[in-house]
Amino acid sequence: MQDVPPSCPIVVGIDVGGTKTHLRAVAEDGTVTDHVRTSSGWRPHDPEAAAAWLAALVHEALPAGTRPSAVAVGGHACETPRQCAGIRLALRELLDVPALVVGDAELLVPAAGLDKGVGLVAGTGSVAVGRLSDGSPVQVGGWGAVLGDEGGSAGLVREAARAAWAAHDRGEDPDELALGLIAAFGVSEVPALGAALESATDVSAEWGRHAPVVFAAAAAGSALARQVIAEGGRSLAALVVRLAQRGVAVDDVVVAGTAVLAQPALYDAFAAWLAEAVPGARPRPLRVPPVEGAVSLARSLL
């Protein structure tokens, strides 16, 4: 990491994920500053609070007295144009610079160096975004760990628990998946998993951190875990199908998120289902940090 000289004009891109936030400041001379912190305190459904959180992050990351030339943000759980616009207006008022706020999945296409395509995130949660020919944004999926986020870490754990409960109801002995979940949640038996999941105060984060249990169980031979992963991959592919049905160009599907990129079993399931459902779609794993897309969007404001 290099420090940006206080006098050098800079653009700031921010990727606010479900768990981690990455700010990147790029100076006119090419100097780059990276600042990473947790996303604790991010409240995207309160525009004033979200803007204040972002402004504090900018001041925390940049040298004292430095004002960026432009700021672009991709925010987790920024789900509608109206919501994003509210945060943008409040942030622009606080920083007095050009600002743009979009959902975090919208960072993927520009991060990949593309002008159009689909951005699909499967990290703690899952969501896919694209744009119609007139530039209007379209988002599908998401909805949080309780109702949706299929194929994301939290959704996989939820579905794994459901699979373990169903096996228990069929009278089956606990397999590697059930035993792994019991150990991870610190309970004594499968029926106690329900209370353990319901006691979470931060559902997405607390469920999602146990996703490695699902993949470990699959590697150990659990048919239940393998089915959960396969269904997760199909759910991710279904997000792309929904975008295509709504008129979004889905030739290029830029994929990011630790759940899908760090776990070949999930990525392979997604790619196989996508090839079957939308033969012309090309999955493209993102090989650079999504914050690069925010930097690109910030530059476009100048």
What are these regions (language model features)?
Residues 52, 74-79:
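Alpha-helical substrate-recognition element adjacent to the catalytic core
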Residues 74, 102, 254-256:
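Solvent-exposed beta-strand sheet faces enriched in polar/charged residues
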